[in-house]
Amino acid sequence: MARDYYGLLGVARNATDQEIKRAYRKLARELHPDVNPDEAAQARFKEVSTAYEVLSDPEKRRIVDMGGDPLESGGGAGGFSGAGFGGLGDVFEAFFGGMSGAGGGQRKPRGRVQPGADSLLRTRLSLAECAVGVTKHLTVDTAVLCDACHGSGTHGNSKPVRCETCGGAGEVQSVQRSFLGQVLTSRPCPTCRGAGETIPDPCHKCGGDGRVRARREIAAPIPAGVANGMRVRLAAQGEVGPGGGPPGDLYVEIVEQPHDVFVRDGDDLHCTIRVPMVDAALGTTVVIDTILDGPTELTIPPGTQPGEVSVLRGHGMPKLRSGVRGDLLAHLDIVIPTKLDGKQTELLRKYKALRDRDRAEVMSAQSEHNSGLFARLRASFSGR
């Protein structure tokens, strides 16, 4: 008597392929030996696997629907046959949601044509180059399209064929024993490296990779306002992918060189200006050779003190992709002379004498004012 394969899976005779697969996955989760060590469950798992093997095969299912039993008709033994596990994939899929590499839950092979990797170059820029922008001509060692096969990887008129090792799946599977029981593992096919295809007659120049290593000259436009550590992206200027795949991007990282005069802080520039003591006292004008505007006058007001900061608005670095510019901040260092000649010494002594006289006059006037005030206060109290 023919076995009731539909009953073993608990589905109707008119169940769809998806309904049959869902029923099998559910039972496999419950009965798999790694989950349920009971001997009765293991026997039931074999029956369920056999039923799925039969009903997932259109020809075998047709025999069942006609009242026959395909396994009794030479269709093969049930239980743990390779087909019964759908290449072991359906059991694995039942537990891990389609992560297996074979059967109904297999991943697609990645294919021979893959996107290329991104590349990174570093280039040194002066502060002036960062300020105005520049086009740097760089040399890069990268993967380029093979000019012999134009990326196909084949020689002459040969074409890729399905990998015999993995059957085109791109990966192979194995069952390993662990303390949890038998574990199914998948790994990329060692023959085709996950592509699912091999090339019987590969290109003599690139060896079937579709690309070769070469040195390229690249013109990299660097916009004004870049700073140290920034990366400029050049689309599709990276490495060509395996099989002639689309190239990745090239990133140019900025290495900003220190400047002799200016120190950068974001979009602002800082510098130190040495001002003679007399000029700081009387006021003066100094000229600063700015990065973008050349020689520019800076006014030092009379009485400027050491450490004060004078600002030139809009004379700093440009903001990236913006017309706005930062400021230039001049830190004033008042220089006191260490050596004086006789005339200079005499003049300074005269200045000191004048200053001392003025100070004495101020103090005398203040003293007289205080004396008059105290006298008025005494008179006020004595008159009471």
Swiss-Prot record:
Keywords: Chaperone, Cytoplasm, DNA replication, Metal-binding, Repeat, Stress response, Zinc, Zinc-finger. GO terms for molecular function: ATP binding; heat shock protein binding; unfolded protein binding; zinc ion binding. GO terms for biological process: chaperone cofactor-dependent protein refolding; DNA replication; protein refolding; response to heat. This is Chaperone protein DnaJ 1. CXXCXGXG motif repeats lie at residues 146-153, 163-170, 189-196, 203-210. It is found in: Cytoplasm. Homodimer. SMART domains: DnaJ. Its main location: cytoplasm. Pfam families: DnaJ (PF00226), DnaJ_C (PF01556), DnaJ_CXXCXGXG (PF00684). The J domain is necessary and sufficient to stimulate DnaK ATPase activity. Zinc center 1 plays an important role in the autonomous, DnaK-independent chaperone activity of DnaJ. Zinc center 2 is essential for interaction with DnaK and for DnaJ activity. The keyword Cytoplasm applies. GO terms for cellular component: cytoplasm. Zn(2+) 2 binds at residues 163, 166, 189, 192. Its cofactor is Zn(2+). Zn(2+) 1 binds at residues 146, 149, 203, 206. PANTHER family: CHAPERONE PROTEIN DNAJ, DNAJ HOMOLOG 1, MITOCHONDRIAL-RELATED. It comes from Nocardia farcinica (strain IFM 10152). PROSITE patterns: DNAJ_2, ZF_CR. Binds 2 Zn(2+) ions per monomer. A zinc finger (CR-type) spans 133-215. Belongs to the DnaJ family. Participates actively in the response to hyperosmotic and heat shock by preventing the aggregation of stress-denatured proteins and by disaggregating proteins, also in an autonomous, DnaK-independent fashion. Unfolded proteins bind initially to DnaJ; upon interaction with the DnaJ-bound protein, DnaK hydrolyzes its bound ATP, resulting in the formation of a stable complex. GrpE releases ADP from DnaK; ATP binding to DnaK triggers the release of the substrate protein, thus completing the reaction cycle. Residues 4-68 form the J domain.
